[in-house]
Amino acid sequence: QRQMCIRDRDNRLKDFKKVFLIAGSEPLGSAGLQADIKAVSACGGFAAGAVTCIVDEDTQRVKDIYTIPVQMIVNQALSFLEDVGADCIKTGMLYSVELVTGIAELLNLFKDIPKVIDPVMVSSAGDRLLKEEAVQAYKDLLFPMATIITPNYREAEVLLGRPVTVS
């Protein structure tokens, strides 16, 4: 594994914790890969990632979703993980059974790296970001290998099959 370092104000090398992100991209910068990169950077980490989907949305609704071919996502992830390595892998929007399955197979190659599984299912505007048939694939393939699962309350309702009371 290569070290990811920069020099601090005193010209000393600073080592970063490396987080590899596998998530969707959206134009607002308030969710997905863009938001994850900001969050990791704000915590002093080094973020790298592979885009799973390109989402066309505005503040009102999701207009279209384009999925990146699974093999391209896996290739990008392997290029980084085998060369640089990661201290953590975080997933975001995976959208389909094919993506969930492909990413699960990839993550199984890196059993020793902690995994944050964010089951992105519903946009902040309430639009579906995960095909219904992919919910079970998350439960069967990704959740068992997760170090932590981070659903929001809407996603928790989908996973539980019942309303969740937020107080």
Feature locations, PLM:
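Short, small-residue-biased leader/transition segments that mark boundaries at the very start
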Residues: 1-6
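Small-residue (G/A/S/T)-rich helix-start motifs and N-terminal tracts that mark the onset
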Residues: 7-88
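Fold-independent oxyanion-binding glycine-rich loops
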Residues: 22-25, 30-31, 51, 91-93, ...
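Non-cysteine beta-strand/loop elements that form the S-adenosyl-L-methionine
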Residues: 48, 52, 114-119, 142-154
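A short acidic, helix-capping loop that chelates divalent metal ions and anchors anionic groups
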Residues: 55-63, 123-128, 156-160
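Alpha-helix N-cap and loop-to-helix initiation/capping positions
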Residues: 64-72, 130-134, 164-166
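Glycine/small-residue-rich loop that forms an oxyanion/phosphate-binding "nest" at active or ligand-binding sites
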Residues: 81-141
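Conserved phosphate/ATP/ADP-binding segment of small-molecule kinases
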Residues: 132-167
